[in-house]
Amino acid sequence: MNRREFNQAALLAGGAALFGAAGFQLGAPSKAMSQTLPTLPDPEASGIEHIVAVTMENRSFDHFFGWMPNADGQQAGLTYLDTKGAAHATHSLSGDNTGCPGKDPDHSYTGSRVCYDGGKMDGFLLDTANDRYCIGYYGEKDIPFYAALAQNYTTCNRYFASILGPTFPNRMFIHAAQTDRLTDSILPTTLPTIWDRLAAKNVSHAYYFNNVPYLALWGTKYLGITRTWGQFQRDAAKGTLPSVSFLDPRYTILDDGTGNDDHPHADIREGDKFLYNVFQALSKGPAWSSTVLVVNFDEWGGFFEHVPPPRAEAANSVDTDIVNGKTLLGMRLPVVVASPYSAGNPNSPIINSLVFDHTSVLKLVEWRWGLQPLTPRDASSDIYNLAYALDFSSPQTAVPNLPKPHTPFLVVPCFENLTGLFSSRAAQPGQVGAPSSSAQKTALWGDLRTMAQKNGFPVG
């Protein structure tokens, strides 16, 4: 079975699982599929020498990638009821690059469960913190570079956030395979991380950032491995990137149009441009032939999604919604794996339908360099190693000619509470002009940036 045949079979099996076919757990891969997984090579002989993970912010699969053929996406034609029983249809956001002034959709631990609604996935407008912005969607032409990257490489359409909750808990999973909080908080943490495992095995590693280093939550512990976006570009150009690199975008600290993380109300054209620059730096560098680039999103941002997340092995007891030792994953994310080992055909894009989450990236790192799992989550068979999204039989080092992002364009700041400047997208059921949770989130990033600066991080 070659990779394309395997991915097609996985898509069919995954779809059957989601509809509760006999012998399947909701959203989980089938036993039959686990028996037909391709055999992974010896890690040291795999050809992979560099893994780069870039984590954007707050978009669901249907919202960003629902247009993609054969990927189980849905966009137009869905309707959701609000708290008054009125039906609202999903709508295109094309041309509205910031979503301003729609409210930053609720994606808190509690609000997410209103949207999830016991797996019915119909509560996005039953959450009173939301307006119609949360059921809007973008098309292929709105994110030309990222859309083309997805179609020329491998898209994961069953990659879920690690917890049904907000940014900080999910980003903690990205580094630690667990979280010690259910809310966005800058309280310091001491959780062991993948960086500790890499250091113990003398595997080179670095964390790169733009304006706020998330690793500052660990105090000064990881100051020595933290580098700037400019350094990432230089290292990629020279072929001196370490074995493992995680890269964060420019977080949307203010609604001033300068963020490139895709978090509302950042301009998605800025995010597309950032990802283009990341890919150019890697694919034009001397180490591209041995590199795997993973572009994921920390969580779904409260945007509509029709596929209910499955449960997976609990990493610890912080998430109290545990059923038979398993907790809910978050919603699906628009994730792409770009590498000579994941190249595809844009006329028939590769869709991988195995169940992944953020610990799948950690599993890939652990597999490649012989590291022990951090928690029961990344040790679990509930979640697959992202290596199964790769084809080791015939790497294709030729780089496709991908479209450039929309440039140049005018950056327009978004001010949520300016009366009279609101579009119909912000109409009922949300209150027009009401403050959204983005104000709290941006203040939090600002506080973390200040804390990092005091601890000596190169935040400028």
Task: Give the ranges of each region predicted by the language model.
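N-terminal pro-sequences and low-complexity stem/linker regions of secreted or lumenal proteins
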Residues: 5-460
